[in-house]
Curated annotation (Swiss-Prot):
Ligates lysine onto the cytidine present at position 34 of the AUA codon-specific tRNA(Ile) that contains the anticodon CAU, in an ATP-dependent manner. Cytidine is converted to lysidine, thus changing the amino acid specificity of the tRNA from methionine to isoleucine. This is tRNA(Ile)-lysidine synthase. The N-terminal region contains the highly conserved SGGXDS motif, predicted to be a P-loop motif involved in ATP binding. One of its GO terms (biological process) is tRNA modification. The lineage of its organism: Bacteria, Pseudomonadati, Pseudomonadota, Gammaproteobacteria, Moraxellales.
Length: 459
């Protein structure tokens, strides 16, 4: 005869269900939960529990990586379970790129999740405590820092995905007992035992040895990940303050950077180089930026490429420049174009957007009636800047204005019949002294620079 008192497992299960309900209150009332279900024991239990606790607010998706002959049948298996439980269901095949199979499959999977998530939906995944511990161990072996050792968070905003992992504190043994008790069917993926994959090797080879020596290892390492998440949050706050003091997303003032301790310099560089990407650069890449760019000779044209950007030093400032933008500096244009201007017209050029506006001193309105030439800079030109004495080499004026070397190719000369009227630059229009200058004239006024243009074109 069964005891009237609840068993330990039943008590724990009730507590877990209650915790699930409490966590769900962090999301808006109209939230729908998209369950990523592979058909494995963990995700099948999660799908069952979520559909019980949140009826009519759950749907499921199976990502078919098409890497195994059985993958399609697994999708049908999950589909049948979902239909029996009246859960809306989607099968999404993906193509996994070559390379590191585990990483590429993960990238394809999350891209598929993102494409299916609606604005009011949260992605719910069945990662458990052993998954978390394996992640920490593998990242430790790959040399990860504080953020990497924080591993997975229970609730995390990842690009455009809000991800919830409610089972991170649940052990695999607890999941096994619960699935057995509820008699939930599931699939056994044999690749989980293939030790050619790092995670399977960790699980099948390393785990038993460590578990035997350290029985509480799983709970301890899982706790460490939480402490690392706390440390990473504090570090992020400090580094954001340092970044605000030393620069912004695109540049760092090296004189201010070097006032920090060496440890904070290294951390800030890593944080800054990451930009809006998911991961920070490798330790070695940060060291290379310090040694090959920051510490290079003053007259050296040092530049280092990483993750679609070049890191370049100019006038004791370290810049982060998009690859295609930086490489354009070597392009020399011979194209001469003709333009006609009128008052208030906008002109989009390589150096920015200019608007024709009235000025106390400017060019004659008579020029509106004539075709003007836009000439590329060839080198050797001289300019008599309005308000200054004598002719100056245009190159010297550009250097004096500290126009960044990789933007100088955008400079164009406005001319009429071989008379220089002015120069379009990323820092504005430079009026040249000529017979066409007069009081109450007009000038092109820079209203958005080349950086703004780049952002607009990529948005």
């Amino acid at each position: 005869m069964r005891s009237a008192l609840p068993t330990f497992d039943e008590i724990w299960q009730r507590k877990f269900r209650h915790r699930l309900l409490i966590q769900a209150q962090q999301f808006p009332a109209d939230t729908v939960f998209l369950i990523g279900c592979s058909g494995g024991m963990d995700s099948m239990l999660l799908l069952h529990l979520m559909s019980e606790l949140f009826p009519h607010k759950v749907r499921a998706i199976y990502i078919d990586h098409q890497l195994q002959s059985s993958s399609r049948a697994w999708g049908v298996f999950v589909q049948n379970f979902a239909q029996q439980s009246h859960i809306p269901f989607t099968i999404q095949p993906v193509i996994v790129d070559t390379g590191n199979l585990e990483n590429q499959a993960r990238e394809a999977r999350y891209a598929a999740f993102e494409s299916h998530l609606k604005s009011n939906e949260v992605l719910v995944l069945a990662h458990h405590q052993q998954d978390q511990t394996e992640t920490v161990l593998l990242r430790l072996l790959s040399g990860s820092g504080v953020k990497g050792l924080g591993a997975m968070k229970e609730i995390e905003q990842k690009k455009n995905i809000c991800c919830w992992r409610p089972m991170l504190s649940v052990s695999r043994q607890q999941i096994e007992h619960w699935v057995e008790h509820l008699k939930i069917p599931y699939i056994q993926d044999l690749t989980n035992f293939d030790t050619t994959y790092d995670r399977a090797w960790c699980r099948e080879t390393v785990w038993p040895v460590l578990q035997k020596r350290f029985p509480k290892m799983q709970e301890a390492i899982s706790r460490t990940s939480i402490l690392m998440q706390d440390a990473d949050e504090i570090l992020h706050e400090v580094l954001q303050q340092d970044l605000n003091q030393c620069g912004d997303l695109n540049h760092l003032d090296l004189s201010r950077l070097q006032q920090l301790s060496l440890a904070r310099q290294r951390q800030l560089l890593s944080f800054w180089m990451k930009g809006k990407a998911i991961y920070r650069p490798a330790f070695e890449m940060v060291e290379r930026v310090q040694q090959e760019v920051i510490c290079a000779k003053a007259d050296a044209k040092a530049a280092l490429h990483w993750n679609h950007h070049y890191y370049v030093r100019y006038q004791n400032i370290l810049y982060r420049v998009e690859k295609n933008k930086y490489l354009q500096k070597d392009l020399v244009s011979n194209v001469v174009s003709t333009i006609e201007l009128q008052m208030d017209a906008s002109l989009q050029l390589a150096s920015g957007v200019f608007q024709i506006q009235p000025m106390q001193m400017g060019l004659s309105p008579q020029l509106f009636e004539q075709p003007l030439q836009l000439l590329p800079r060839q080198g050797g030109e001289k300019i008599h800047l309005y308000g200054r004495v004598g002719h100056w080499p245009l190159k010297k004026a550009i250097q004096e204005a500290q126009i960044l070397p990789w933007l100088r190719h955008t400079i164009q000369i406005l001319a009429l019949d071989n008379v220089m009227l002015g120069v379009f630059t990323p820092k504005g229009f430079w009026l040249a002294q000529s017979s066409y200058c007069e009081a109450g004239g007009w000038q092109p006024n820079l209203i958005s620079d080349v950086n703004y243009l780049r952002v607009e074109q990529n948005s």
